[in-house]
């Protein structure tokens, strides 16, 4: 199933601006009839799922039950959010990221922590390898650039990479124009 993948924090709550923005992203994706895939838990994953489900599309949540029990040590709920209508259980974080990237038409990276950073880097590296091997179309990656700018801008300098490495990203401000044209 083709979908648009959204990565983001599990920590924001309903009523916070980050949550509301993520819900709007989900609504926008669903408005144009695209299915959505997230990590399936709370925070921005829940907000995106809620917005997309309200538009009647399939909302896949790729969970990792072996790592995330019903409650974590800190008391955060770790069940799929109630807006997921297609749970995919992955065996590991690596498998989870693989499922989320597989068949993805586009990737949206919202603010997050180390898990979101890992997902961003795997998606970024996948596009880099696709570009080198010229055997697959690049997956458009949309960032909330005001949040990710420092990492994205400095990383190629620190790793002595070609500045072309930065061309893999689009600003989330261009999202509606892009999503409206996807098949």
Where would I find each of the regions flagged by the language model?
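Acidic/glycine-enriched connector segments
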Residues: 43-110
């Amino acid at each position: 199933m083709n979908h648009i993948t959204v990565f983001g924090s599990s920590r924001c709550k309903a009523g916070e601006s980050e949550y509301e923005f993520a819900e709007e992203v989900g609504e926008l994706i669903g408005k144009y009839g695209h299915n959505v895939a997230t990590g399936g838990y709370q925070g921005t994953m829940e907000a995106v799922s809620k917005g997309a489900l309200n538009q009647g599309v399939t909302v896949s949540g790729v969970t990792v039950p072996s790592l995330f029990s019903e409650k974590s040590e800190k008391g955060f709920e770790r069940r799929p959010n109630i807006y997921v209508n297609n749970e995919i259980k992955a065996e590991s974080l690596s498998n989870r990221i693989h499922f989320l990237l597989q068949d993805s038409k586009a990737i949206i990276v919202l603010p997050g922590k180390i898990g979101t950073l890992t997902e961003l880097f795997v998606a970024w590296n996948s596009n880099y390898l696709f570009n080198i091997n010229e055997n697959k179309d690049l997956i458009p990656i949309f960032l909330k650039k005001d949040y990710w700018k420092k990492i994205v801008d400095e990383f190629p300098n620190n790793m002595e990479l070609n500045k072309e490495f930065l061309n893999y990203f689009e600003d989330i401000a261009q999202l509606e124009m892009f999503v409206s044209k996807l098949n």
